[in-house]
Amino acid sequence: MFRTMMNGKIHRATVTEANLNYVGSITIDSAILEAVDMLPNEKVQIVNNNNGARIETYIIPGEPGSGVICLNGAAARHVQVGDVVIIMSYGMFTDEEAKTHEPKIVVLDEKNHIEMILPEEKAHTTL
């Protein structure tokens, strides 16, 4: 049996752009992607802390160090510039792999620079 587990998480990213006329996706600073082991074209779930919206799309890498978090296409309808979002990727793991898997989690500051890297998500963690 395989279980779907969180593999990477970008916590408290601030939306820098929303481009309705682009052909879908989310553009993410590639330095952030590297820190959480996310790849171009990988499916991600985005949760908007401001309005509760949950959407899925795929990743386009942005300029490293730019701090870009841009929702494109229809996804742009679910955010405003300045909204705080959580971006998560998932992987399929066997039961044995799932028991030892540790997702990569980063917490960003208000300019989308990595503020801290968490080794794993603890229950009831408040940032």
From Swiss-Prot:
Q: Which GO terms describe its molecular function?
A: aspartate 1-decarboxylase activity
Q: Entry cofactor note text?
A: Binds 1 pyruvoyl group covalently per subunit.
According to its UniProt record, the EC number is 4.1.1.11
Give the keywords, sorted.
Autocatalytic cleavage, Cytoplasm, Decarboxylase, Lyase, Pantothenate biosynthesis, Pyruvate, Schiff base, Zymogen
Q: RNA-binding: present as a keyword of the record?
A: no
Query: Which pathway does the database say it acts in?
Result: Cofactor biosynthesis; (R)-pantothenate biosynthesis; beta-alanine from L-aspartate: step 1/1
Which positions form S-S bridges? Answer: none
Localization terms from the record: Cytoplasm
Tell me the active site.
25 (schiff-base intermediate with substrate), 58 (proton donor)
- Pfam families in the record, alphabetically? Asp_decarbox
Q: Which residues carry this modification: Pyruvic acid (Ser)?
A: 25
Entry GO CC: cytosol
Q: Which reaction does it catalyse?
A: L-aspartate + H(+) = beta-alanine + CO2
- Going by the record, the broad EC class of this enzyme is lyase
Q: How is it modified after translation?
A: Is synthesized initially as an inactive proenzyme, which is activated by self-cleavage at a specific serine bond to produce a beta-subunit with a hydroxyl group at its C-terminus and an alpha-subunit with a pyruvoyl group at its N-terminus.
Could you name the domain of life of the organism this protein comes from? Bacteria
Which positions in this protein are listed as binding substrate? 57, 73-75
Subunit info here reads: Heterooctamer of four alpha and four beta subunits.
Family, according to the entry, reads as follows: Belongs to the PanD family.
The record's function comment reads: Catalyzes the pyruvoyl-dependent decarboxylation of aspartate to produce beta-alanine.
Protein name as catalogued? Aspartate 1-decarboxylase
Where does this protein come from, organism-wise? Listeria monocytogenes serovar 1/2a (strain ATCC BAA-679 / EGD-e)
